[in-house]
Amino acid sequence: LLKKIERVNKMKKMYTIFILLLGVFNLSCSESKTGTYSENKTEKNIFNTIVDTISGAKFEYNVAESTPDTFNLVHLFLPESYDAQLLNDKHPENIRNYEAADIFDLLFEGLVRIDENGKIVPGLAEKWETGKDKTKWTFHLRKGLKYSDGTPIKAEDFKTALLRMLNPEIISPNTDVLFLIKNGREFYEGKVKAENVGIKILDNNETIELELTNPIGYFDMLMTKVEFSPLNQEFFGKLGEKYGKIPENILYSGPYIIKSIGKRKLLLEKNKNYWNSSNIKMNKINVYGGLWDGDDHKRIAESKGIDATVVYSQFFSRAKLKNDMKETQRLSTGSSHYYVFNTKVKVLSNPKVRKAIDAVMAGETRKEYGFVPEYISINGKNFSALAAKNGKTESESYHYKNIKELLDEGLKELGINKMPVLNIVIKENSIDRFSENLKKYLGIDVKVTRVSYKDLILKSRKKDFDIIENEILLGFSDPILYLERFVSDSPYNYGSYSNSEYDKLIKIASETKDINVKTDVLVKAENIYEKENPAAKMGYGEITHVILERPGIKGLKLVPYGGILYLRNVNKAK
């Protein structure tokens, strides 16, 4: 039976990152066992159309002169908006926003941030602490902080930003993080006033205290999002909808400001009022945005004045360049695509029922063990391999000669004689590849509801579904940031899955500093996921970025979080 399902689902294993995340084009790609996309003529023709559409065919850049204190970068994308809180609001499903987040990292800074090594480091807060119960997090601002125009940065500016993010008119996946704050969700739903939210301003506006509803040991990691950077209420109030539209209508809290915005071009200058300005080496960074393949990329990379460029390896022509620009770094990241089961729906509260549905929906992709993507490592070892070895078996459903028997067992345990119609919510541009199979192999009737990505987020938050499509865009490098989604009180636990042992393991992993302990408990948590099936994992999309740079460029680094590039340390050898 499974082989039949696998044949029906042959083309379903990987979804194409470039299209699902761009949300613009429908494109089918062939794939390899590792999840990277192979190139073919159809793929390249469609891709060239995207190139022409996004960046304009043969568009010529007037590249600025490369000087010792000027860095000229060719980037894949430029942001659609320069309003930090709206980074992922306009098109939250669009990969453009996620890949261009590294530009925002230069313009804005929050209480804490992630450095080039993936570690949480002080940002505008010089220190922070939390109590033993992990429900109160206190952040102490640095002395004398200023925005780019010299206006003091105060603790209340962070409160303004957080409350703005809790405005239901702003649809960003990262808003869910703020539901962890006491009465954060209630404020979002209009049930309480701002003064009832667990945000306190202390110490003469130099300290902010965030009170959580439940203990979260890794809350500081969640607060590294650029959307949580400060917002001056007076400045924002005067501009209203004009805020962030042009460089002059932005207050910058990061190491750079926008000097000018041109056609596919962004000119940045050092923010002299940034607290750590003396350690920022480049006075100017010129970013040229676009998307290239083959000859187009080669032509741009060879342009006089370009210091570095980042490209997708899948579409990078490896023809030797006529200059001294060389490949120096390569990094694979990716996205996870899955469907969440609403465990509050009686028929989906049983693991056997979920496992049977998962087996049919995911088909051959379900051969992967657990939830964490195959390319993720921990402690120098492949995480999925460790978890599968520890679990000793793949999904139990594959050991049944007839998956229908597994479904019937689950229904019997629930005292249900017949499967009800399931409401499956998917994105409006997604393809329904499972309704026919669910009916054919399990006798389950399905109602498919297609919605916009924003409505998908809203329905997820309201738990208005039986099964709902979800994805993690440009995934994380740490397994815990995947597995924490199924912790009972996680803001991303849309299916209300709850397992006390699982919660305990994730809590230990979030608090321990021993990598061996962390690895052990996360593997155990993955084993629980594999047994309980709170979601149907449809696979993952892996993509590899490549940096090409000229000799003498230092400090530029590919990172799997907060965009794709770490640009703060860029400098040139003298």
What annotation goes with each model-predicted range?
Residues 547-574:
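Long beta-strand-rich cores associated with HINT superfamily self-processing modules
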Residues 212-280, 284, 295:
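Gly/Pro-rich hinge or "lid" segments in bacterial periplasmic/extracellular proteins
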Residues 129, 140, 173-234:
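Surface-exposed binding/hinge segments that line
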Residues 365-410, 426-430:
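Structural transition elements
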Residues 72, 154-161, 205-211, 255, ...:
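Alpha-helical secondary-structure segments
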Residues 74-132, 163, 251:
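N-terminal lobe/hinge region of extracytoplasmic solute-binding protein
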Residues 51-52, 64, 394-396, 447-456, ...:
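Extracytoplasmic/peripheral linker and loop segments enriched in polar/acidic and small residues
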Residues 259-267, 286-344:
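Extracellular/periplasmic solute-recognition and catalytic clefts
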